[in-house]
């Protein structure tokens, strides 16, 4: 397996490394979009604030997702501030490079987008009993999202290239159980969103509800470190604005994102984490008709599969809290 293939695993595995570890998994573990959580999915934790303080030390994150074949590689840089272990706000800049497909990569020929996030803990983990999960509500706003929907707006002659704004509003419930016989980290949530594949897939045709979640198993490594093998999922909106206009049947097939990942971090009061994962995102999403330009008896059009070649992607992430 060469380096390019290896690095193609990301988008998701990443997502689910959405699982943390020790009793302080609420510290600096940031998602691709700059929230405390796994690689992609948010948890009910926020950036840790020292006792007696209102403001946390800032947490920073860097993530890389290799989807170079069609979509193009994605990098994000995040800065997040926590407040009294009750809330956090953050800013993430998504940096994008052009993919390698002459046929389809033009739909992602943009520098990236801005991502603003916020989260509030409404119920702290363990309130009223050790089995009670933490519950948080939060939101994301992505601005300057030209991907797919914006690009097709111009290519289809519907208007100018459009920079869309899309949002997520979510609730997440998270429980870390570190007792025998089996330590577990469980995270499940629901979001209302109008973004496809976290904005990378464009704007969905409507605002709708989607589920996400994951499970991890915290394992001690020695020297104060722990590993969290995990698996997770994120449901995607069924359709993308403008995309059906170029597909046979008028509909795309956007599958649920799956991920399998490992997170390495400190067991107590963690200041860093490293994520590495394999994800299954989107592959063949449909067919498009392409004119042959040939005279009869040759067919006037041929059907070409629209393959995003992102069913096996590699991602990595680094997070650090000062």
Tell me the role of every PLM-derived stretch.
Residues 62, 77-81, 116-122, 171-175, ...:
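Residues on the lipid-exposed face of transmembrane beta-strands in outer-membrane beta-barrel proteins
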Residues 101-106, 147-155, 197-204, 239-253, ...:
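Outer-membrane beta-barrel translocator domains and adjoining extracellular loop/strand segments
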Residues 54-60, 75, 85-87, 114, ...:
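Outer-envelope beta-barrel architecture signal
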Residues 158-250, 256-257:
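Detector for outer-membrane/organellar transmembrane beta-barrel domains
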Residues 83-85, 119-133, 174-179, 217-221, ...:
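Outer-membrane beta-barrel proteins
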